Structure formats: C-alpha cells, structure tokens
Amino acid sequence: VEVFRGAAGRRLSSIECHDLCCKIAQIVVVGGVRRSALISLSNLTDDRIRRCKSGQWWVDNPQRGLANNSACYTEKPDFPAFLDEWKSLYESYSGERGMFSRVASQKQAARNERRDATYDFGTNPCSEIILRPYQFCNLSEVVVRETDSLADLKRKVRVATILGTLQATLTDFRYLRKIWKTNTEEEALLGVSLTGIMDHPVLSGREDNVKLKKWLTAMREEAIAANKEWADRLGINTSAAITAVKPSGTVSQLVDSASGIHPRYAQYYIRRVRASKNDPLCAVLEAAGVPVEDDVMSPSTKVFSFVQKAPDGAVTASEMGAMEQLELWEIYQDYWCEHKPSMTCYYRDHEFLEVGQWLYNKFDKISGISFLPYSEHTYQQAPYEPIDKQTYLKLKKEIPTVIDWDIREEDDRTEGSQQLACTGNNCEL
C-alpha cells in the first residue's frame, strides 16, 4: 500500500515493480512451503536493481530474497560496460546480478530448426528453459547413476521424454488468458534434464570428451525420436525444444545424486536441513533421535544434521576449477541441450579474470550460468560442512535406522520455515 501511495500520479519505478512481485511470491505458501519461484530480468543500466541486494537488504526488504536477479542483454556490451557488471557481481559475493543474453537464447533456439527464434525470449527462474512471453516450462528428469551404460541412459531419457510429452497435453488453463494456452500448445515445450552428471565417469567428462559428445548426441536423438512418436500418438505438436539441464537442488537431495551438472560438495559432509518447530515432521525426526539443535539465527526453527558420503569416484567441488566447469557447460550446451544448461560456476579469486575473459569472448553463446565465489570456510550451522572419513563413520552411528511415521498431525500448521531463491542461498550453498 505504501508503494502505491508513494507512486501516486506517476509510473512505478523498476525497483517498486520488483518489490511488488517479490511480495506476491512471498505470500504464495501452501502447507508451510513456498510455492513460488521468481526471476527478475532488468536492463543493464538499471543500477537500482543491480544494487538491490546491497547493504542490509534482508532487514529492510526481506522479500527481495525471493528473486534471482539477472541483467538482460539484448546485444554484446562493449568491454567497459561488461567489466562494470562483472566487477559488481564480484563485489556482491552473492552471484548477482546474473547474466541472461536474449541474443544467445535466440541463437540457441534457432539451432534445431524446429522453433521460431525471432521472439524476445525470456527464461524460467533457474534459467535453463528458453521461453516466449506467456509460456510455461514442462520439466522431467533423468537421475544418472555412476554405473549407467549408454543403453541405460537412453532408456531413462526415453521415459522422461514420454512423461514430458504426456504433460504437454495438460493445457486447460481455466484462469489464464487464451494466449497462454495458444503458446503452450503451439510449441509443446519439454524440459528433459539430467541430474547426477558428476557421479558418472563418462558424463562428468573424466574419461574422454569425444566419447562424452557421442553419448550426449545419442541421448538427445533418443529424446527427439521419443517425443515425435508420442506426440503423434497423442495428436499434439512435436516439441519445439526438448533437452536441458536444470540445477536440481531439491530432486538431487531426494534421490542422493550430484545436483544437475554440479560437483558434489565433498567426499564426506554434513547436510543440515531446517524445519519450523511447528512442523509435525520436526517432532517425528526429533523423537526418532535424528541429531538436532536450535537454529542460532531463528528461535522458531530447528536444524537437523545428516551425514552424507559421495559415491566413490564422484567429482567434488574442491577438485574442479572454474574453467573446467565452463568447458563442460559448453559441451552440454552444444551436444545435449536444445534449451540451456543451468549451472552455478564456483570460482577462486585467482580465476576470476580468466573466467571474465572467457565469458566475454563467448558472450553471444552464454546464458544460464551464475557465478559464486568458492570458499573452504564454513560458518555456524552451514547447510553443507565437509568432514573427514573418521568423523563420517562416528556421526553415522548417531543417525537412526528406523523412524516411527505413525505420529499424526492434529492441527493446521501451515506457517512453516520458508526458503529463499536458489541463487546463493539454497540449491548449491
């Protein structure tokens, strides 16, 4: 209300629109869980959005934590302008603003010759799907295991594609304008993704990039063929774009895999999960003996600790430099994706300038990458904490092997512990 009163007689500013959208995202809660995702694309010259997470923004404007912020490029900037934005990203220590290139999206959309690439494309909140205005993503996912053969992966890709094609028939949007239905049916987009890439000897690029490219090409062709077969059966359009790599911060936790195209955090580590004290699940886990403590930052929240072990041979964050991550990203962009691979690239200070030069040289190709500083330091109750094998074995004994799930919720307790947007705060950190 204060925002609208303050803007009486004039247009809303970009930061006012941004804050209003963030506030809307903040109140979309079901069952105590945030059910919104938000990306804010802003002009390169918009300094208000560029610096909207500077200072103590989480005190004065906590709603801003609900959005991932990216600058939207309509052309390759001159080097001084790029350098200003790159320097601002470094100084933020939060990976923002990210970089979304409309030119790169148009070039990628044109590659498969099944899509009209003249639109002013945008993207979904994690920036792996290339979207027209008034359009949805339609995601399904392959869980890659370290022992998967090419035949295994093709079978999984086929199943994920069939699921996505079935989902593409669900276009009865009763409360939206007709243009949403028109665009969704016309392009029938899929988003067949891979998670656990860094757990696999071939897909992680550890064996041979030539072999990797052949496998990815075969998998992509399997997806295209499966979509055509099932779209014909269902009487819908074949998909204008099928394959992507999403960050998979949540799915990877559920299935115990490396997330998307990212490396595992460490060989052995503690994974901490927060829960509202009002959440019945909190009482179940505490009663079962799962290690728990009060959240030092939030009196109404508990922190549960689970020890984790990466698969033998899995790539970890400490083993992979920024340039290795970017080179692998480019392979997936060229040989797997019809959309984009979404990736958080972790850089050390000595790599930052080299990464910036690589990014500028390939600017018209790059979209869907965020950048965060890699740190071996941990803070109290961090979501991830590396440990050694001895500590892992010791703490593993404290985790119960059986949990009694018969406790029932008797009250409506939907005011749960909310999570913020994935960049810099949830999926990968």
Give residue spans per PLM region.
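Core structural elements
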Residues: D19-V30, I162-T171, N183-H200, V245-V251
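Short acidic, low-complexity intrinsically disordered linear motifs used
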Residues: R413-L429
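Secondary-structure capping and boundary motifs in well-ordered enzyme cores
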Residues: E16-C17, E128-Q135, T182-S193, W215, ...
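Catalytic alpha/beta core of large soluble enzyme barrels
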Residues: L89-E91, G98-S101, Q108-D148, D152-L176, ...
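Flexible, glycine/charged-enriched surface loops at secondary-structure junctions
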Residues: A7-D19, V28-S40, T169-T182, D208-K214, ...
